Regions:
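A short glycine-rich, Lys/Arg-flanked "PGG" loop and its adjoining helix->strand segment in the class I
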Residues: 134-146
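A short SAM/SAH-binding and catalytic strip from SAM-dependent methyltransferases
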Residues: 119-132
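Class I SAM-dependent methyltransferase SAM/SAH-binding core
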Residues: 53-57, 61-110
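N-terminal, positively charged/glycine-rich alpha-helical extensions of SAM-dependent methyltransferases
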Residues: 1-24
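A short acidic, Gly/Pro-enriched loop at the edge of an enzyme's catalytic core
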Residues: 109-120
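Short beta->alpha hinge that forms the Motif I/post-I loop of the SAM-binding pocket
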Residues: 80-81, 132, 155
Length: 168
């Protein structure tokens, strides 16, 4: 995980560009399909706030944004550094006939939105890939309304030695 070290942006982008078509399958395998449940829980947390403007950072193939799109009256912006991941996301929303999500290529460390704009910001499995953790989180808080919620979904390396072995 990124512990505020500078990570090579180009390297991260290239990785996600190359795995975009397999990404969802890989998530199914690595989480034993639990990622779908965890992503739905983000939407459940968000619903309590009745948000109108939502930003999904590191949206990838759009799963979290799609779950959030079910919130009545909401408008979702999904951003990611990978054009190929966003192509998969756009294909999904077209097939599902979802029209309240807009995807764009954008770095978490340099968001293209005005200050205090979003009611909710979600980041699923993205914080670890920020090229600069502090800058990425500062940008998130810049565009989040003062009474808004930042919801982060991340995995960690388990402490149980038997399970930990599977992560190495």
């Amino acid at each position: 995980m990124n512990k505020n070290k500078s990570i090579d942006f180009v390297q991260i982008k290239n990785i996600f560009e190359s795995i975009s078509n397999e990404y969802d399958f890989m998530n199914d395998l690595m989480t034993l399909r639990n990622h779908s449940k965890w992503k739905k829980e983000i939407a459940e947390i968000a619903i309590a706030s009745s948000p109108k403007r939502i930003l999904d950072i590191a949206t990838g193939t759009g799963d979290i944004a799609i779950n959030l799109s079910k919130i009545n009256g909401s408008k979702i912006e999904g951003v990611d550094i990978s054009d190929n991941m966003l192509k998969v996301a756009r294909k999904k929303i077209k097939e599902l006939k979802i029209n309240n999500i807009n995807f764009k290529t954008c770095e978490a460390e340099n968001l293209v939105f005005e200050d205090n704009h979003f009611d909710i910001i979600s980041i699923g499995y993205g914080v670890r890939n920020f090229s600069n953790l502090e800058k990425g989180l500062n940008e998130s808080y810049r565009v989040l309304k003062k009474d808004g919620k930042l919801i982060i979904l991340e995995t960690s390396i388990p402490e149980n030695p038997i399970i930990k072995f599977l992560y190495t």
